[in-house]
Each structure stands twice: as structure tokens, then as C-alpha cells.
């Protein structure tokens, strides 16, 4: 469970950072 959660987090973080930089 935590392994999957970690993978999702690693994919989500760059996406969120990208959205913040665009704003």
C-alpha cells in the first residue's frame, strides 16, 4: 500500500510544482 502511495506522490509532486510555476 505505502509503496503504491509513494509512487503516486512522486508523480503528483512534479505535476503540482509545474502547475505552481505556471501560475
Swiss-Prot record:
Localization (cell): Secreted; Target cell membrane
Tissue: Expressed by the venom gland.
InterPro entries: Antimicrobial_4
Main location: secreted
Keyword terms, alphabetized: Antimicrobial, Membrane, Secreted, Target cell membrane, Target membrane
The keyword Glycoprotein is assigned to this record: no
Keyword NAD assigned: no
Any single GO BP term: defense response to other organism
Membership in a protein family: Belongs to the non-disulfide-bridged peptide (NDBP) superfamily. Medium-length antimicrobial peptide (group 3) family. Ponericin-W subfamily.
Source species of the chain: Dinoponera australis
GO cellular component, one term: other organism cell membrane
Domain of life: Eukaryota
Pfam family, one: Antimicrobial_4
Protein name listed in UniProt: U1-poneritoxin-Da3b
Amino acid at each position: 500500500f505505502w509503496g503504491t502511495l509513494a509512487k503516486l506522490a512522486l508523480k503528483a509532486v512534479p505535476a503540482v510544482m509545474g502547475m505552481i510555476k505556471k501560475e
